[in-house]
């Protein structure tokens, strides 16, 4: 089988690896001048800093962890602490230690803060019971919180910041986020149960190392960088890929895997079916301006609240504002710390690099489209992959890429 893959993120790379291992001929098209998608490692003064994909764990990233082992890529343990800073309320708290919960020592005698902490515990317990009973299936986060009569403080100081940080969502959009998806993610990552916390890890030397190792193991000429695909024409006998190089060129393939964002995939299809148009068109995306810098002004004001993930609210913007401490996460020099901020309110001093990442918005329409899109795999010799098939994380992208490859292999075998 001669198959084209469009997109060299984790989904496309995983599919390419599986297909070439099975003896098929693969051409992997990438519009950018580098492979990896949301893997984005910047080198600064001899230090490799990740700006996109950062962490994984053995329990919830089994396919990805196995891939790293196969490639001989080592990881190191990290911490996944979280903090919230609400300057307009002069309120800060963190999850790293007991001291972090009371980063502002005045909250030790604050009935309101103690009530908030009690509400967090109550929320986690109630969420576990509701998930088991299937009681959250049709509710948004705001509807769920109102249904269970949780206090406003829980929403503003915990639920919305956490949802915004996890999915790079604008705070104003978090209330419409499906409650079941939010709660199931927390549950699967050990946040709703009194169990051993998941052991999070980062790639030693930066995540780009695994991309480079994977690409090096592909057959020569598999990857075609700086080659944007402009149109995909399908017929009964194959697929024509129209690409832009120095000029428009065409190439013929047996099948195609679209390992891109859903909206990109829809734009590439020459004559999408009604089902493809409905499923792919259900996904919305938001762009987040992402800056690597060493400006500690983007961390919570109180050092006790500093964490790996820091949500710092800005009432003057509708965008999510999260700062990741890469020094904590990757064990990098921390004087001053290496930081990655999404949508900084002002330009950071000591800025090193900036890039824009686009993230899927998992509203109810998108979640319903996941199953519909999976059912379309194989129709018109076309397959789909990407992190939008799951929670939007690296493991989801890899799993979908492997599934698309397996389906294409099975379809080709069935044709003979």
Where are these regions (language model features)?
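N-terminal Rossmann-like FAD-binding beta1-loop-alpha1 element of flavoenzymes
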Residues: 2-28
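Conserved Rossmann-like nucleotide-cofactor binding loop
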Residues: 11, 34, 263
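Glycine-rich FAD pyrophosphate-binding loop
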Residues: 20-44
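N-terminal glycine-rich dinucleotide-binding loop that anchors FAD/FMN and/or NAD(P) in oxidoreductases
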Residues: 41-65
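Mobile amphipathic helical/loop "lid" adjacent to a hydrophobic cofactor/ligand pocket
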Residues: 61-179, 183
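Conserved flavin/dinucleotide-binding core of flavoenzymes
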Residues: 96, 318-416
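Helical element adjacent to the flavin cofactor pocket in flavoenzyme catalytic cores
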Residues: 184-245
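Mid-domain catalytic core of redox enzymes
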Residues: 227-360
